[in-house]
Amino acid sequence: MGRKALISVSDKTGVVEFAKELEKLGFQIISSSGTARVLKENGIDVTEVSDITGFPEIMGGRVKTLHPKIHGGLLAVRDNPEYMKQLEEQGIEPIDIVAINLYPFEQTVRKGADLDEIIENIDIGGPAMVRASAKNHKFVTIIVDPEDYGSVISELKEKGETSLETRRKLALKAFRHTAFYDSVISSVLNEKFGIDEKFPEEFSVPFRKKDTLRYGENPHQEAAVYISPVEYKGLSVAESEVLHGKEMSYNNFLDVEAAVNLVKEFDETACVIVKHNNPCGVAISHTPEKAYREALSRDPKSAFGGIVAFNRSVDIDTAKALTEIFLEVIVAPDFDKDAFDYLTEKKKNLRLVKIKNFDKKAEGPDYRRISGGILVQDRDTQLYNELKVVTDREPTDKEMEDLLFAWKVVKHVKSNSVVIAKNKATVGIGPGQTSRVDSLETAVKKAEEFNLDTEGSVLASEAFFPFRDSVDQAAKYGIKAIIQPGGSIRDNEVIQAANEHGIAMVFTGMRHFKH
């Protein structure tokens, strides 16, 4: 009874060479129709699955390998005499090596196929054989990745068989492969069927490794970046293209995500500068260069080594301005050719990053890892519920423009946060303080440090004011209008303080905590 290898692959990469090497090593090659045809065309002696089972492929190939003579050969425990006796009685022979990859479900979805074609590309027999082989890895070598053909052949040539360690590694890879495959299917069908089940009792999320990163948040931490195969239509920082410069770091990805999410809030030409996941300068202007210079002037100290994001293509004037200080990453929908050439010549290590689907919204929910589990929530894509003026004085049109600008910015600042703004540019940003009044003081100190006048500015707070103290302080710095969610039990006291100081106040009815 010679050794047998079952090969049934949709991805034919390297399969002919693999089968030829197995044939040289004395393996009988068993294959299903499509793969068998390719192997036969290349001079390989193949036994078709239907010849083993005595049963033809039916229903257009839907049923071909789901048969006891296949699965018995895969699942037989070779050191169990009773199992082997049953195998012999049923005329079943063990299968030693299995090479399978599955119907191209993901690729079918990406090409825009209709639902019938998508469902037809859900593999049934393939995963069954993969799982059976992986379960019986003590005796069976399962290969789901063409990249592993070479190492298996080398080991067979050197040792005559694969080691248990190799079979375990390949079995684990196989189980991951089928789990990934099924999670892609469930994610896609959830969307295609239009079933609004936001938080199902059980779910899995597929991710595919894109790159191993140099390290994680700190040098002693290892890290990698993964992409979602089912969120391919939406904005994707994970699949961003580094057009020039060093590879992206873990922290670069986090900062780019923060910068892109904020700059996309604006329809007008805008620039955002981010440092350690918080904006340090944001501005709107008529050109990308002017927006950048305005944003930079708000906190040039923090901007050093920062990430700069635009919502317009980078032109040559902007490129020249960007080379004046050290920056880590420039993010934009695109780069004009002369701007790109200038930046690549002047800054060899500066990362120039083009975001995939910049004009689209990010897909999927927001996940946060906690010990022993995960938190899942909707993305914070809304801006406000209703704009309601709650004070005696209404904001002027210009103040309202600045209030809405500041509100968009504060939504993306770590809580507790306060943003002071004027003329569609930040004046001071107070992020991540444990009290709201401290956030205000931090924002004011930043403004004072860079000689930015707070007189006539506006203030945004991402959550309500628990006391009137922040409003009293804001008045001392010449702030003329405030935007906040409202909802405090002391709202009346806060509104009274605003009225006393002649400050216009707008409630949004929506909080934007960010942790």
UniProtKB/Swiss-Prot annotation:
InterPro entries in the cross-refs: AICAR_Tfase_dup_dom_sf, Cytidine_deaminase-like, MGS-like_dom, MGS-like_dom_sf, PurH-like
GO annotations of cellular component type: cytosol
Pathway assignment: Purine metabolism; IMP biosynthesis via de novo pathway; 5-formamido-1-(5-phospho-D-ribosyl)imidazole-4-carboxamide from 5-amino-1-(5-phospho-D-ribosyl)imidazole-4-carboxamide (10-formyl THF route): step 1/1; Purine metabolism; IMP biosynthesis via de novo pathway; IMP from 5-formamido-1-(5-phospho-D-ribosyl)imidazole-4-carboxamide: step 1/1
Keywords, ordered alphabetically: Hydrolase, Multifunctional enzyme, Purine biosynthesis, Transferase
Ranges where the MGS-like domain occurs: 1-144
Catalytic reactions of this protein: (6R)-10-formyltetrahydrofolate + 5-amino-1-(5-phospho-beta-D-ribosyl)imidazole-4-carboxamide = 5-formamido-1-(5-phospho-D-ribosyl)imidazole-4-carboxamide + (6S)-5,6,7,8-tetrahydrofolate; IMP + H2O = 5-formamido-1-(5-phospho-D-ribosyl)imidazole-4-carboxamide
MF GO annotations: IMP cyclohydrolase activity; phosphoribosylaminoimidazolecarboxamide formyltransferase activity
Taxonomy, superkingdom: Bacteria
Keyword Cell division: no
Any one Gene Ontology BP term: 'de novo' IMP biosynthetic process
Similarity comment: family membership: Belongs to the PurH family.
Domains (record comment): The IMP cyclohydrolase activity resides in the N-terminal region.
PANTHER family: BIFUNCTIONAL PURINE BIOSYNTHESIS PROTEIN ATIC (PTHR11692:SF0), BIFUNCTIONAL PURINE BIOSYNTHESIS PROTEIN PURH (PTHR11692)
Name of this chain's protein: Bifunctional purine biosynthesis protein PurH
Gene name for this UniProt entry: purH
